[in-house]
Amino acid sequence: MLVYLAEYLTQFYSGFNVFSYVTFRAILGLMTALMFSLWWGPKMIARLQLMQIGQVVRNDGPESHFSKRGTPTMGGLLILAGVFISVLLWGDLDSRYVWVVLFVLGSFGLIGFIDDYRKVVRKDTKGLIARWKYLLQSLAALLIAVYLYASAQSPGETQLVVPFFKDVMPQLGGFFIVLVYFTIVGSSNAVNLTDGLDGLAIMPTVMVAAAFALIAYLSGHVQFASYLHLPYLPGAGELVIVCTAIVGAGLGFLWFNTYPAQVFMGDVGSLSLGAALGTIAVLVRQEILLVIMGGVFVMETVSVILQVGSYKLRGQRIFRMAPIHHHYELKGWPEPRVIVRFWIISLFLVLLGLATLKLR
């Protein structure tokens, strides 16, 4: 929004031209989202406490989590508000990339909000019925997938980039829709499964978003894209604003979500942030790279799949409890140790993912 004002004022004072640079606006976007979260966080937490919107803890969960019962939840609204305000202020609102991610954040955030509402207000520990949640996620993801396929403006927008291989970028054709669907829905649910300990999900989300900010900048720059053998995506640079807004809002939220948490993000945060990461990966054509950099999310999801599959097929469980972070809790690891070690793994995987841009 302020881009247009700065563009108008540039004719009177050339210094306003600095707002035309994506990097400058990205820094402002990060700072805006961060400061908003830090400023509004205590007010939101107090409001949630007043409304008695507290975390519902299942009786079959780890005993150490019983003390978390009643901790304010739905803090993901703070993250979403920070991202939306920051992007609307500093982003180029003529960019379809920006609106696609905002739509995904809003739609999946609404699904998560309904789920949280049923849990904390109506006291239904199961929340939104699983089939309805999956149906709503599928509708939103398919809508985006079809739109991106129909509105593709260059061949690079529907290619699959394969890490470690320089010129292997096959055209996907109609399979593009299938890939987009599974990337968005899968990423959304993976982050949701990871959000089980204080700060466990938000820090890897911040790391992956920061990495995608760099990738989006490179993909939107014709010379860097050519040098690194990435598909050149005109206008993708505006995704940098979205990514840094997620980083800023996420760090601000972590201030209150770090152990012991004062607030949880709830499904309104985890479902929307996961879907946003999947959408950004799709837009910059790095779905495979998301699997690498978001390895912690993948690990958590696979642990659940293996646990359920093993129990149904063999009647035996592989882990003491799934997702896998609960397995380590039941082994006696203190919660902060599990969290920080998963953060370290996430940092390593993000750096590995970025290294693949050059290792071709």
From Swiss-Prot:
GO cellular component terms, semicolon-separated: plasma membrane
EC number: 2.7.8.13
Reaction(s) the record says it catalyses: UDP-N-acetyl-alpha-D-muramoyl-L-alanyl-gamma-D-glutamyl-meso-2,6-diaminopimeloyl-D-alanyl-D-alanine + di-trans,octa-cis-undecaprenyl phosphate = di-trans,octa-cis-undecaprenyl diphospho-N-acetyl-alpha-D-muramoyl-L-alanyl-D-glutamyl-meso-2,6-diaminopimeloyl-D-alanyl-D-alanine + UMP
GO molecular function: metal ion binding; phospho-N-acetylmuramoyl-pentapeptide-transferase activity; UDP-N-acetylmuramoyl-L-alanyl-D-glutamyl-meso-2,6-diaminopimelyl-D-alanyl-D-alanine:undecaprenyl-phosphate transferase activity
Annotated TM spans: 26-46, 73-93, 97-117, 132-152, 168-188, 199-219, 236-256, 263-283, 288-308, 338-358
UniProt topology in membrane: Multi-pass membrane protein
Entries under Pfam families matching the protein: Glycos_transf_4, MraY_sig1
Keyword Flavoprotein in annotation: no
Subcellular location field: Cell inner membrane
Pathway membership, UniProt: Cell wall biogenesis; peptidoglycan biosynthesis
InterPro entries, sorted: Glycosyl_transferase_4, PNAcMuramoyl-5peptid_Trfase, PNAcMuramoyl-5peptid_Trfase_CS
Gene Ontology biological-process annotations: cell division; cell wall organization; peptidoglycan biosynthetic process; regulation of cell shape
This protein's UniProt keywords: Cell cycle, Cell division, Cell inner membrane, Cell membrane, Cell shape, Cell wall biogenesis/degradation, Magnesium, Membrane, Metal-binding, Peptidoglycan synthesis, Transferase, Transmembrane, Transmembrane helix
Cofactor: Mg(2+)
Family recorded in the similarity comment: Belongs to the glycosyltransferase 4 family. MraY subfamily.
Function in brief: Catalyzes the initial step of the lipid cycle reactions in the biosynthesis of the cell wall peptidoglycan: transfers peptidoglycan precursor phospho-MurNAc-pentapeptide from UDP-MurNAc-pentapeptide onto the lipid carrier undecaprenyl phosphate, yielding undecaprenyl-pyrophosphoryl-MurNAc-pentapeptide, known as lipid I.
Name of protein: Phospho-N-acetylmuramoyl-pentapeptide-transferase
The species this protein was found in: Shewanella halifaxensis (strain HAW-EB4)
Species lineage: Bacteria, Pseudomonadati, Pseudomonadota, Gammaproteobacteria, Alteromonadales
Protein's gene: mraY
